[in-house]
């Protein structure tokens, strides 16, 4: 069973995928700043779900290190009992901010099993591009969610890795 609920008009989601029940990229409080406040600060156009009103969930998935995905002020308001799975750059940021929290690193191009789901993280090939990760979330029936909130171009190796799965849901931007 797959259930998807949008938590804001950016990239925060609540996903139920078989036995997996998790929140992706929660930015639910205040503004987000990319770089310098005077250069690029963004606010929600529509009020997001309040932290205290989040649906039940077992863990968090943080896909990017950017503040609209890895929002420290929101994460400070979420119970530290909730484990976090994070891509490499987000993991480094989170480990500095929350040294005692249960945070699992999702290594690039490796299958990581967690709560009856498998996670594969892809990073782009181009060295000069910003690092925008994609995460594939697979259930025990080889059905998958492909989450690439900034878009993503698969290389041949990554494409061959996901060909064995049936992608049921694509969450991405189309800009």
Task: Cite the ranges covered by each PLM segment.
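Active-site neighborhood of phospho(di)ester-bond hydrolases with catalytic His/Asp-centered motifs
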Residues: 24-25, 57-70, 85-88, 146-151, ...
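Metallo-beta-lactamase
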Residues: 86-142
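Active-site environment of divalent metal-dependent phosphoester hydrolases
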Residues: 9-11, 31, 65-70, 91-94, ...
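Active-site-proximal loop/helix segments of hydrolase catalytic cores
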Residues: 125-175
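N-terminal pre-catalytic "stem/leader" segment of glycosyltransferase-like enzymes
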Residues: 1-16
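Active-site HxH/HxHxD metal-binding segment of metal-dependent hydrolases
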Residues: 46-110
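Active-site-proximal beta-strand elements of phosphoester/diester hydrolases
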Residues: 3-6, 22-25, 118-125, 144-151
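Pre-active-site segment of Zn-dependent metallo-hydrolases
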Residues: 20-61, 73-74, 153-164
């Amino acid at each position: 069973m797959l259930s998807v609920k949008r938590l804001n008009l950016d990239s925060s989601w609540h996903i139920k995928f078989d036995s997996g029940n998790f929140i992706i990229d929660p930015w639910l409080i205040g503004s987000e700043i990319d770089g310098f406040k005077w250069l690029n600060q963004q606010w929600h156009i529509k009020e997001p779900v309040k932290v205290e009103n989040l649906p039940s969930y077992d863990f968090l998935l943080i896909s990017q290190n950017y503040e609209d995905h890895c929002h420290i002020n929101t994460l400070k308001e979420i119970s530290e009992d909730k484990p976090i799975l994070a891509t490499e750059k987000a993991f480094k940021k989170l480990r500095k901010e929350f040294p005692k929290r249960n945070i699992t690193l999702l290594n690039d191009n490796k299958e990581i099993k967690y709560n009856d789901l498998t996670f594969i993280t892809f990073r782009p090939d181009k060295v000069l591009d910003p690092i925008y990760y994609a995460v594939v979330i697979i259930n025990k029936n080889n059905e998958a969610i492909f989450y690439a909130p900034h878009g993503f171009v698969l290389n041949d190796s990554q494409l061959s890795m996901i060909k064995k799965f049936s992608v049921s849901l694509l969450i991405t931007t189309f800009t």
